[in-house]
């Protein structure tokens, strides 16, 4: 989501955009998708105040709300900031407090049998600058993956929504992340990669992603997933509660679906949402129905987003009175 275009009133915060467990994965009850879940937002808030103060600049998910989504939903995408784990540089030591809070959240989720996806919500930036040091980026991921290498239900998401970057750099950063994670001993976990141009599904073939991202390699068979995001407003930014049409969800996935099939790749819709109105609800259901029909390539989807500081945000899935929680929860659960 292009959160730089949105202003949220979320408490006093400004918005930014492990222990081993038994392998008791929660799968969708009717086999529709491998993954169906929710983004958890808050640890990435307050990106202009680094490292920031917990409770003032950023917040961690309220763990008890995870139980509200189980057993229908089996994956939670935890949005963090790279700079809060390594303050001064990507190769710095991990901050013990932020890491401990991340582990607490991850372990709570995975001990419930669900997947916890860790994603640096950094848009391919570190401390405000586009990441170009591929080796340092790999070091960051090596250090982080080492902490979760024994937790089979962690999913690693290389970076949230690269944009306005040299395509070759985006590919190299993704590959460096994959290699670093595997090199750290995290060999059983899924990894999701993201493309340039906000990793949009609708622009996957026109952005350069289709021409270059397919060459990524992973030593672990069947564990690499291409994560795309898709919103249904006029510019796909997720900044409006208005959806273009009742069929826009399916339409914006069609070209990407063809690419996934033609290239023998697996896809995941890591962010999606729609406004609280009939047109959007029909569009969201149409999109999920289309993904269900093509679940040979589409592995699942995650709603954007839950989190304790969303207030009356139009897409809030925060229990129990979030706008989307009261209007979309049953719709999404029907695909579990």
Residue ranges, per PLM feature:
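Fungal secretory targeting signals
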Residues: 1-25
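Extracellular low-complexity, O-glycosylation-prone Ser/Thr/Pro/Gly-rich "stalks"
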Residues: 17-34, 39, 45-57, 311-336
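Active-site mouth of glycoside hydrolases
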Residues: 27-213, 298-299
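Short loop/turn segments at secondary-structure transitions that flank enzyme active sites
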Residues: 44, 232, 307
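Extracellular glycoside hydrolase catalytic/binding regions
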Residues: 54, 58, 139-142, 146, ...
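Acidic carboxylate-rich catalytic motifs and surrounding loops in phosphoryl-/glycosyl-chemistry enzymes
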Residues: 272-273, 304-308
């Amino acid at each position: 989501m292009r959160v730089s275009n949105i202003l949220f009133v979320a408490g006093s915060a400004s918005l930014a955009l492990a222990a081993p467990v038994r392998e008791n994965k929660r799968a969708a009850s009717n086999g529709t998708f491998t993954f169906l879940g929710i983004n958890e937002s808050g640890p990435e808030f307050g990106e202009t105040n680094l490292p920031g103060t917990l409770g003032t600049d950023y917040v961690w998910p309220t763990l008890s709300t995870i139980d509200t989504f189980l057993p229908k939903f089996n994956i939670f995408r935890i949005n963090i900031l790279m700079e809060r784990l390594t303050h001064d540089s990507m190769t710095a030591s991990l901050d013990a407090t932020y890491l401990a809070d991340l582990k607490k959240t991850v372990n709570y989720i995975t001990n419930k049998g669900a997947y916890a996806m860790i994603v640096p919500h950094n848009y391919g930036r570190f401390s405000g600058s586009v990441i170009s040091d591929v080796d340092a980026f790999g070091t960051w991921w090596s250090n982080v993956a080492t902490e979760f290498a024994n937790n089979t239900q962690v999913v690693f998401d290389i970076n949230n929504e690269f944009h306005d970057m040299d395509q070759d750099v985006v590919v190299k950063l993704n590959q460096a992340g994959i290699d670093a994670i595997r090199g750290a001993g995290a060999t059983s976990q899924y990894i999701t990669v993201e493309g340039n141009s906000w990793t949009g599904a609708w622009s996957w073939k026109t952005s350069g992603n289709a021409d270059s991202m397919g060459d990524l390699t992973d030593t672990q068979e069947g564990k690499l997933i291409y994560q795309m995001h898709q919103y249904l407003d006029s510019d796909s930014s997720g900044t409006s509660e208005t959806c273009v049409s009742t069929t826009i969800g399916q339409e914006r996935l069609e070209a990407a679906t063809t690419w996934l099939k033609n290239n023998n790749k697996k896809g995941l819709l890591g962010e999606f949402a729609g406004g609280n109105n009939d047109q959007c609800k029909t569009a969201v259901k149409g999109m999920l129905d289309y993904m269900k029909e093509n679940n040979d390539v589409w592995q699942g989807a995650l709603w954007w987003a839950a989190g304790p500081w969303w207030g009356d945000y139009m897409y809030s899935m925060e229990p129990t009175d979030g706008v989307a929680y009261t209007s979309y929860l049953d719709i999404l659960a029907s695909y579990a």
